[in-house]
From Swiss-Prot:
NCBIfam families: RNaseIII
PROSITE patterns listed in its UniProt record: DS_RBD (PS50137), RNASE_3_1 (PS00517), RNASE_3_2 (PS50142)
Family as reported in the entry's similarity comment: Belongs to the ribonuclease III family.
The RNase III domain, residue ranges: 51-175
Protein name per Swiss-Prot or TrEMBL: Putative protein A464R
UniProt keyword Lipoprotein present: no
Alphabetical list of SUPFAM superfamilies matching this protein: dsRNA-binding domain-like, RNase III domain-like
């Protein structure tokens, strides 16, 4: 097991700055590049991120700074220190509850199917990571230099987890009402609610349309798949042996949705039914 002196020599990194164990209560974060979302003033000046910086980030006073250090820790500063995984586990449930209650209260005339589809959008990695990036959470991720060289602090999956861990930290420190207040404020500030409200489950629309006009169930045929850092998928929609459309995306699911949307247009389905 590494002792503390070795950890100090190795250091750990927040943003692009190396820090060591002596900064266990204040950790260094980088100067914010103009291409990134604006962070707290201390982020832009390159000084320590402190309790006050976290309060600036979430918009309310905090009590226990250690919860937030844990929420932002992708790598432990020293052997045995907590990282965000357990906090993210709790934050995921806190976020799910807050979103479910928000949808229930704000859409009284909508059925369970609509609420479920909208909840799926709210908790999607794409949505949460985009909000995290706009907030500048990548500036707070505590990570070793190797990860930063590879851009892991802006990785959508990591940002999604860090956002959920932050929800967990606020819940543990300040309670469920504070966590709800933070999420609602963040939603109003960073989310494109108009786009979010669009029912974009084109695959479901296509399946309903083919049943309505008594056509065979569409087949979704994978034409091309490439994984790795830049994934790419191509899917054909085939009905009754005939190719109707082709869709592309960064996941098979996205490719199926895009192919379904094109198929609906190709089949002459009215725009109001598609959306």
């Amino acid at each position: 097991m590494e002792n503390i002196s070795k950890c100090m020599e190795r250091g750990t990194t927040v943003g692009t700055m190396m820090v060591s164990e002596r900064f266990k209560d204040q950790v260094q974060i980088p100067n914010t590049d103009d291409n990134f979302p604006e962070g707290p003033p201390s982020t832009k000046s390159g000084v320590m991120f402190t309790k006050e910086d976290v309060e600036y980030l979430i918009g309310m006073p905090i009590i226990d700074f250690s919860y937030y250090k844990t929420a932002f820790s992708y790598n432990a500063i020293v052997e045995g220190e907590a990282t965000y995984e357990r906090m993210e586990f709790v934050g995921d449930s806190v976020l799910g509850f807050i979103i479910a209650r928000y949808l229930y209260d704000n859409f009284p005339g909508k059925d369970e199917g609509f609420l479920s589809r909208l909840r799926t959008k709210f908790v999607s990695g794409k949505f949460l990571s985009s909000i995290a990036l706009r907030m500048g959470l990548h500036n707070y991720v505590i990570m070793h230099q190797k990860g930063l060289y590879r851009g892991w602090n802006t990785n959508p999956r990591i940002l999604e987890d860090v956002f959920e861990a932050l929800m967990g930290a606020i819940y543990f420190d300040l309670g469920i009402n504070a966590a709800k207040q933070f999420f609602m404020t963040t939603l109003a500030k960073y989310a494109d609610m108009q786009s979010l409200m669009l029912d974009t489950n084109y695959k479901d629309r296509l399946l309903k349309h083919t049943r309505k006009v008594e056509l065979p169930r569409p087949e979704f045929v994978s034409v091309f798949e490439k994984g790795g850092a830049n994934p790419s998928f191509i899917v054909d929609v085939v009905i009754n042996g005939q190719k109707i459309s082709t869709g592309t995306g960064k996941s098979r699911k996205d490719a199926e949705q895009n192919a379904s949307k094109i198929a609906l247009h190709t089949m002459g389905v009215p725009e109001e039914f598609i959306h």
